[in-house]
Amino acid sequence: MAVGGAGAGAVRDGRVAGHLKPLGANRIAELLERAQDVHVLVVGDLMLDRYISGRVGRISPEAPVPVVRVEKDWSGLGGAANVAANVVALGARCSVVGCVGDDAAGRELSDALRGMDMDIDIEGVLQVEGYPTTVKTRVMALRQQIVRVDREDAGDFDGEVGDQLLEAVRRRIAGCGAVAVEDYNKGVLVPQVAAGVLEIAEEAGVPTIVDPKRRRFSQYEGVTVLKPNAKELEDALGEPLQPQSRAWMEAVRAGLKCHHLLLTLGEEGMALQSEGEEPLLVPTWARSVYDVSGAGDTVTAVLAIGLAAGGTVAESAVLANHAAALVVGKAGVATVTPEEILHHAERGDP
């Protein structure tokens, strides 16, 4: 796939113009080994994911909808909590800052985070009275999602909660190698908090990665890596995407005022635009797609780990793409291990 401004096969700084040079298994192993010694701070909207799985045997006589006979149900971590789960699964230390409600779901979510690993700090998770913990319930049958039911309050938290969140970030920034911000538009990342997190990280010299929601793109000025998905960016801009065009990608990056724009393109992979450079395309390496739930969370987590481990943004994007290719082959919101990523790379995938 050619990219505007560079002919296929032209080499610049060790990269084939338009396509990221494959990252060798040795370098991937090195980054994953370094990940065991890094600390990532995760800030954002915490969610609890519930799953109900069963078989469809008939249509309901009450309405033209399938009747699911439940065979099993389980819960998992979603949103920023899933980012934290992915960080810990790769062996890094993690601190989490966010909010849950003073309810059973909030306690379940906190217990699930606390039970993952000794190297996770959840003292920065605030329990907010009167706020319902966000719960997404997915009903599954025959490897397909039939319906999703959301329980949430998407209103913004007040200034007092915002002050407490920023104080939690200040107390945890020392020693962090990266800050991952996961914005699901559920009230945590109001402008006050978003700007404050970026300012605290910048003062500490810590790179930031933001997975934004459409209506909040403009509040992340100065972020190291902004990582929207294709639909969010297209909706925000109101125009078709042109990830192969250097002029278009650079104009979008400059307009969003981020140092690096990493656009996730689903089955087409990713496109990375760094200031003053050609856009670099990272093809998808997924061999099978079972469930895309939480894949963006995995990418955010692995990007943060890659940067914290000393990788470049381009190297971290390749590492994250390996992880995404693996996680979409798993059921529900899932994580990947260092061994899985390394095996994926050694198997000959780009």
What are these regions (language model features)?
Residues 19-31, 38, 61, 65-135, ...:
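Substrate-binding N-lobe of the ribokinase-like
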Residues 35, 173-174, 217-221:
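A short, aliphatic-rich alpha-helical micro-motif
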Residues 41-43, 148, 177-180, 209, ...:
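Structural motif
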Residues 45-46, 298:
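Active-site metal-binding loops of divalent metal-dependent hydrolases
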Residues 99, 125-131, 138-173:
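Conserved phosphate-binding/catalytic loop of the ribokinase/pfkB sugar-kinase fold
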Residues 173-188:
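Short acidic, glycine-rich surface-loop motifs adjacent to enzyme active sites
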Residues 186-279:
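Conserved phosphate/ATP/ADP-binding segment of small-molecule kinases
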Residues 259-260, 285-348:
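Conserved post-catalytic alpha-helical subdomain immediately downstream of the catalytic base
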